[in-house]
């Protein structure tokens, strides 16, 4: 067993079924912290240890994924953190907005979990 610390992912997903599934699958490979809204995700991400990835639902009550991404870019430890957006919004303007918000990937619902895991691994270099 390796002594290398596992990479840390902060997830913001307000749908309990999706957040549970993401936690179950991704925690096999990474340290996962699940939050259910944008404000909580930003609070967790802003405290040490900094996450290696933010996995954000775009449509959440209160602070949406785009707002979390914009706020994260203002924090010194999170300026260059990779972001993956999950969303039901599929229009071209939404994808462009996601990329402009700093997303490495923009995954639309419904998604295949294997595809998401592959994108996470690619983003985190493993």
Regions found by a protein language model. Give the residues of each.
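Acidic, metal-coordinating helix/loop segments flanking the phosphotransfer/catalytic sites
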Residues: 34-53
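C-terminal output helix
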Residues: 111-120
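Conserved acidic carboxylate
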Residues: 13
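Two-component/phosphorelay signaling modules centered on CheY-like receiver
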Residues: 16-34, 123
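Receiver (REC) domain active-site loop signature in two-component systems and cognate sites
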Residues: 60
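Active-site residues of response regulator receiver
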Residues: 57, 87
């Amino acid at each position: 067993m390796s002594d290398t610390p596992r990479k840390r992912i902060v997830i913001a997903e307000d749908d309990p079924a999706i957040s549970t599934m993401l936690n179950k699958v991704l925690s096999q490979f990474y340290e996962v912290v699940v939050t259910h809204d944008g404000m909580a995700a930003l609070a967790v991400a802003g405290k040490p240890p900094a996450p290696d990835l933010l996995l954000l639902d775009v449509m959440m009550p209160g602070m949406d994924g785009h707002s979390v991404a914009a706020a994260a870019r203002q924090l010194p430890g999170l300026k260059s953190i990779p972001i993956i957006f999950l969303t039901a919004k599929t229009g071209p303007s939404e994808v462009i907005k996601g990329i402009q918000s700093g997303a490495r990937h923009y995954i639309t619902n419904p998604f295949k979990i294997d595809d998401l895991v592959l994108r996470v691994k690619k983003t985190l270099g493993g």
